[in-house]
Curated annotation (Swiss-Prot):
Interacts with the RNAP. Has a higher affinity for the core RNAP than for the holoenzyme. Its ATPase activity is stimulated by binding to RNAP. Residues 164-334 form the Helicase ATP-binding domain. Its EC number is 3.6.4.-. The keyword Signal does not apply. This is RNA polymerase-associated protein RapA. It comes from Escherichia coli O81 (strain ED1a). InterPro entries: Helicase_ATP-bd (IPR014001), Helicase_C-like (IPR001650), Helicase_RapA (IPR023949), P-loop_NTPase (IPR027417), RapA_C (IPR022737), SNF2-like_sf (IPR038718), SNF2/RAD54-like_C (IPR049730), SNF2_N (IPR000330). HAMAP family: Helicase_RapA. A motif (DEAH box) lies at residues 280-283. Keywords: Activator, ATP-binding, DNA-binding, Helicase, Hydrolase, Nucleotide-binding, Transcription, Transcription regulation. Transcription regulator that activates transcription by stimulating RNA polymerase (RNAP) recycling in case of stress conditions such as supercoiled DNA or high salt concentrations. Probably acts by releasing the RNAP, when it is trapped or immobilized on tightly supercoiled DNA. Does not activate transcription on linear DNA. Probably not involved in DNA repair. Pfam families: Helicase_C, RapA_C, SNF2-rel_dom, Tudor_1_RapA, Tudor_RapA. One of its GO terms (molecular function) is DNA binding.
Length: 968
């Protein structure tokens, strides 16, 4: 190589050293100084891995003083280059800059600059970059973005609600599904969509204290959302880091009690600029026109400051009209300001519901009914629809559906309230109760007698709680290590049941963690039964491992022993047998226990086994739950109401289970009350609202569409390719399970989402639902999104060289594969990617500028190519540099037409969709006051900003591959 002192070269193997300068040359070696790092390198002259840095007219270069110039002419004298051009800061022309004064921190970011500087990537990285661009663009355009990545079953009514609400600007809605239908999942889906699209960035979730960890686990496990739990301690710590402690985290969970207890804390919450507020158990917020509770006022204050609000609550029928109005008032106080007016409005919706029922029945409509529909919808252009709906044509069904949609759009609260019932949702199992009456051991009888004497001054409530758990009374006198399990007949029954049902997975729930731990030891030591334990003292990771062991079919645990609190938020619908070793104190907790198995998607009827001790509070409670409330075999929406109404009587019977006089009457009264309330709830059902919330055929089609996307084999192939190139080890464990661990040669030292110990993943939704330790990998998973970002935000794979062995072409024939990206810059919340995500345009040009991309598909072509080592590649580039420059100019001339077509199509789509949505809502505003002015304003503003951003869209070269034909 001809070296001259002062020339600038770059290392092919250590490009991070920057621009080097030749400082010494002898017959056999050359020394380069790299000023940006202060390091020297000694190379052999004959075979040095360095590339001469030579810029061309049109390039922008930087001097060591920091100013830039546009190169117009290059002169060479005695082996040294001088660049002549115009300074960009002063616009002075004819400025000369000798190469020795070039900035040494030079970074080659443009693909062509990297290629000419010898920074040649491996061929597989170029292919990965193109695939990443292609798949990333496709995913942004996919319908239902944000709904595919969560670890949940594809349940139509949940997807319907999430799809509707998740796309809105600052949604303010009430989610009031019946228990077990997945309000938490619906809220998580909405959050996931809003965060993924950029519509929201900061989220606050307020829940009862007992549900904080459940929400934390659900958001992380199902949606990969890492929330921070704020309590007094965390709040105090964060005060050292920021004036407003809540500014230290983007996603926060706290309890309602924590929020309302301190005036300053509530002020900090209100000032924290949240985008979305989620309130669980909102029906516990007590309100009346004269005296709203402090809790209600705290949420009301927050709801005034936060644009988006999701309230999760019991069904409107359970709440009562006034309480239901109070929730709606939090969402839109301007719309819901007068309770009497609200009651009157609700009565007026009955004809609308009747009209919808009439359309769905499919019967021919009379002229009077057609006229009534016309008046309700109140639009001039629906006559053809009405005629089609009443005809025998194939269009009749779709016309009826369209009319139903129009009616539902006009339904009073259908935009702010979503409510599904078990009656309206298919897929729930039956529940069968098996009670096992067992004798009360003498040891317990003695302990209870002594406890009664010593605890005479205890309240009835405390005595009732004690009597539910006789083993704890026994341990109070005999010590914590007393071996109650040696004589408790429930333990003997449990061991017998498990040994005779070895093939069944059994969930055992008890009130306390200590009971679960003691039972595990007994089962293991006496019968060798594999039992996992699950309680609140375990970390989330430990609970995951226990749940995963229980989920394993062949070698897993037969039994999972759960404490009351430890099992919150976890579902095990792959099991259908449940044992309640003891009973919870109230019907809500009973339903929560059964709800661990009684979920949509449960394939078998649920067998509920309740071994109970006679003459104890357990025997009282099992009768009251079953005979009084029918709470074991059916969900019990009346449970809390009746529990509150008979609380004192029930407590007395539990505290003194021997005194049974009048107990049969109590059960009879409770059953009558239960039946009456149930009938009242059924009568009050808003069937129109149910149809709207359920989504019908549209929701079913949505679920099926996402299920089809689950089978995308491109994702698996791409992910494996991505992991290989990043340097992530993959260990296939079978059963659709793969363990990923970091290797010693990672592309980056710390890859987000991959811990030192590694992670377990699956691409199969069913496996992910059964095994909570396995992360469900989709295009929306952070691991894939971080991988895409790692590849596309840097220059990985942006320049490479390949050889094409093809005897049909002359040796030395050049082809240049160009990957352009058409894109527009805009704030994330505009969700511009719906219309124009960064979109790759591939061109394959010969030296005459002929574009062969349409005839030569990428993957097929890629398989025909062979890699070139960096040294040989640099030599090839230097030899054909001028030809490549010429082809690049031909490419620049051609890309504009393709890019303009993409941009114009995006503009048309955006204008059409956003204008149509605005027009629809403006038209509905006249007949449905639940459409907020701020929502209309936001859509119009969004449309204008989107169109302006698309007007500014452009394109750039993202990657290139030089291909040289060879016959060898």
């Amino acid at each position: 190589m001809p070296f001259t002192l002062g020339q600038r070269w770059i290392s092919d193997t250590e490009s991070e050293l920057g621009l080097g300068a030749v400082v010494a040359v002898d017959a056999r070696t050359v020394t380069l100084l790299f000023p940006s790092t202060g390091e020297n390198r000694l190379y052999a002259r004959s075979d040095s891995p360095v590339t001469r840095v030579m810029f061309n007219p049109g390039d922008t270069i930087t001097s060591h003083d920091g100013w830039q110039m546009q190169v117009e002419e290059v002169k060479e004298e005695n082996g040294l280059l001088t660049y002549i051009g115009t300074r960009l800061d002063t616009e002075e022309s004819g400025v000369a800059l000798r190469e020795v004064f070039l900035d040494s921190k030079l970074v080659f970011s443009k693909p062509q600059d990297r290629l000419f500087a010898g920074q040649i990537d491996r061929m597989d990285r170029f292919a990965l970059r193109y695939r990443a661009r292609k798949y990333s663009s496709e995913q942004f355009r996919m319908p239902y973005s944000g709904l595919r990545g969560q670890r949940t079953s594809l349940i139509p009514h949940q997807l319907n609600i999430a799809h509707d609400v998740g796309r809105r600007h600052a949604p303010r809605v009430l989610l009031a599904d019946e228990v077990g239908l997945g309000k938490t999942i619906e809220a998580g889906m909405i959050l996931h969509q809003q965060l993924l699209s950029g519509a929201a960035e900061r989220v606050l979730i307020i829940v009862p204290e007992t549900l904080q960890h459940q929400w934390l686990v659900e958001m992380l496990r199902r949606f990969n959302l890492r929330f921070a739990l704020f309590d007094d301690e965390r709040y105090a710590e964060a005060q050292h880091d920021a004036y407003n402690p809540f500014d230290t985290e983007q996603l926060v969970i706290c309890s309602l009690d924590f929020a309302r207890r301190s005036k300053q804390r509530l002020e900090h919450l209100c000032e924290a600029e949240w985008d979305l507020l989620v309130v669980d158990e909102a029906h516990h917020l007590v309100w009346s026109e004269d005296a709203p509770s402090r809790e209600y006022q705290a949420i009301e204050q927050l709801a005034e400051h936060v644009p988006g609000v999701l309230l999760l609550t019991a069904t409107p029928e359970q709440l009562g009209m006034e309480s239901h109005f109070a929730r709606l008032r939090l969402l839109d106080p301007n719309r819901f300001h007068d309770f009497a007016q609200f009651v009157e409005e609700q009565k007026n919706y009955r004809p609308v519901a009747d009209a919808v029922a009439m359309l769905l029945a499919g019967n021919k409509l009379s002229n009077d009914e057609l006229n009534m529909l016309g008046e309700m919808i109140g639009e001039q252009d629906i006559e053809p629809l009405l005629q089609a709906a009443n005809s025998d044509s194939e269009d009749a069904q779709s016309a009826r559906q369209e009319l139903v949609s129009m009616l539902m759009d006009r339904h009073g609260t259908s935009r702010v309230l979503f409510r599904n019932t078990r009656n309206g949702v298919k897929g729930f199992p039956k529940r069968e109760l098996h009670t096992i009456k067992l004798p009360l051991p003498t040891q317990y009888q003695t302990a209870i007698k002594v406890s009664g004497i010593m605890g005479a001054r205890k309240s009835a409530e405390d005595r009732a709680r004690d009597m539910l758990y006789p083993e704890r009374i026994y341990q109070e006198f005999e010590g914590d290590n007393a071996t109650w399990w040696n004589f408790d007949p429930r333990v003997e029954w449990l061991m017998g049941y498990l040994t005779s049902h070895r093939s069944q997975k059994v969930l055992v729930i008890c009130a306390k963690a200590a009971t679960a731990l003691q039972l595990e030891q007994v089962l293991r030591e006496r019968e060798g039964i594999r039992a996992a334990v699950f309680h609140e003292g375990m970390s989330i990771i430990e609970r995951d491992r226990a749940a995963a062991w229980f989920a394993e079919e062949d070698t897993g645990a037969q039994v999972l022993l759960c404490s009351e609190i430890g099992s919150e938020g976890r579902n095990f619908q792959f099991a259908s047998h449940m044992v309640m070793f003891d009973l919870p104190f109230n019907p809500d907790l009973l339903e929560q226990r059964i709800g661990r198995l009684d979920r949509i998607g449960q394939a078998h009827d649920i067998q509920i086994h309740v071994p109970y001790l006679e003459k104890t509070a357990q025997s009282v409670l099992v009768r009251w739950y079953h005979e009084g409330l029918d709470a074991f075999e059916h969900t019990c929406p009346t449970g809390r109401t009746i529990y509150d109404s008979v609380y004192n009587d029930l407590i007395n019977y539990l505290a003194s289970p021997d005194e049974t006089e009048g107990f049969d009457d109590l059960i009879k009264n409770c059953r009558e009350q239960h039946e009456a309330l149930k009938a009242q709830l059924e009568q009050g059902r808003d069937r129109l609202l149910e149809i709207h919330s359920n989504g019908g055929e549209k929701a079913q089609a949505l679920a099926e569409s996402i299920e089809e996307q689950d089978d995308d084999t491109n994702l698996i192939a791409f992910a494996m390719n991505l992991f290989d190139i990043i340097g992530i080890n993959q260990d296939d464990r079978g059963d659709n399970i793969i363990v990923l661990t970091p290797s010693d040669h990672m592309l980056v030292p710390d890859f987000p989402g991959l811990s030192e110990d590694g992670i377990t993943i699956t691409f199969d939704r069913e496996v992910a639902l059964a095994r909570e330790d396995a992360q469900f990998i989709t295009w929306e998973h952070p691991l894939i999104r971080n991988g895409l970002d790692l590849i596309l935000s840097g220059d990985t794979g942006s320049s490479t060289i390949s050889l094409l062995k093809n005897k049909a072409l002359p040796v030395g024939t050049l082809l240049v594969e160009l990957i352009y990206v058409v894109e527009a810059q805009a704030p994330k919340q505009l969700q511009l990617n719906r219309f124009l995500p960064p979109t790759p345009v591939r061109m394959l040009l010969d030296k005459n500028g002929n574009n062969l991309a349409a005839q030569v598909e990428f993957e097929t072509f890629n398989r025909q190519l062979n890699a070139v080592n960096r040294y040989t590649g640099s030599k090839l580039v230097n030899a054909v540099q001028q030809d490549v420059h010429a082809i690049l100019q031909l490419g620049e001339a051609q890309i504009e037409k393709s890019a303009r077509a993409l941009i114009d199509a995006a503009r048309n789509e955006a204008d059409e969709k956003l204008s149509a949505e605005l027009s629809r809502l403006e038209a509905l505003r006249a007949v449905n006051p639940n459409i907020r002015d701020d929502e209309l304003t936001a859509i119009e503003s969004n449309r204008q900003q989107v169109m302006e951003s698309l007007d500014q869209a452009g394109w750039r070269l993202d990657a290139l591959r030089l291909i040289v034909v060879t016959h060898q």
